[in-house]
């Protein structure tokens, strides 16, 4: 059976989503066309609107519909604290903890020389400019604890320390509610090394 080209195009478009392979994309496309055409139309409108309206904040590089995002404009925030994250999703997770009251800088990625991603690709010059504006007192590195995230944190830390800035890193350890029996040895080791007095 020859599939309609429009359906093939939809399937290929859905494959661009992370974690969606050819079979999942095909199932989604067929579901939308067979059971939820209104949902498909809404999805199309939402994607078009987001692509048209969402841009990067001129100050922190996160997603916004304005030149400067609401977080950067919030007078209640401490401009002396700058938290560096890899993605807007990481920023959202930190915001949901209600523990950080400073400002952010979103890298939109992480260093990965094997993938050809260098300092320019993660907006390092923009970060340095922001961090050395005379207002920022401390930069909190909240990159992920992957090899690339660690390399990114190290590179940024060395770069900013050389300019006289105080740089800190998120602590690592046992998750809240986690039982040691189910935590991997690397996490327990890091928690032991990063322990603090109470």
Curated annotation (Swiss-Prot):
Zn finger spans (C4-type): 57-72
Parts of the chain that traverse the membrane: none
Top-rank taxon: Bacteria
UniProt KW keywords: DNA damage, DNA recombination, DNA repair, Metal-binding, Zinc, Zinc-finger
The UniProt record lists the keyword Zinc-finger: yes
InterPro entries noted in UniProt: DNA_Rcmb_RecR (IPR000093), Rcmb_RecR (IPR023627), Rcmb_RecR_Znf (IPR015967), TOPRIM_dom (IPR006171), TOPRIM_RecR (IPR034137)
One MF annotation (Gene Ontology) recorded for this entry: DNA binding
Domain Toprim, chain residue ranges per copy: 80-175
Pfam families for this protein: RecR_C (PF21175), RecR_HhH (PF21176), RecR_ZnF (PF02132), Toprim_4 (PF13662)
Biological processes, Gene Ontology terms: DNA recombination; DNA repair
PANTHER family: RECOMBINATION PROTEIN RECR (PTHR30446:SF0)
Family as reported in the entry's similarity comment: Belongs to the RecR family.
Biological function: May play a role in DNA repair. It seems to be involved in an RecBC-independent recombinational process of DNA repair. It may act with RecF and RecO.
Protein name in the entry: Recombination protein RecR
Organism annotation: Janthinobacterium sp. (strain Marseille) (Minibacterium massiliensis)
Gene: recR
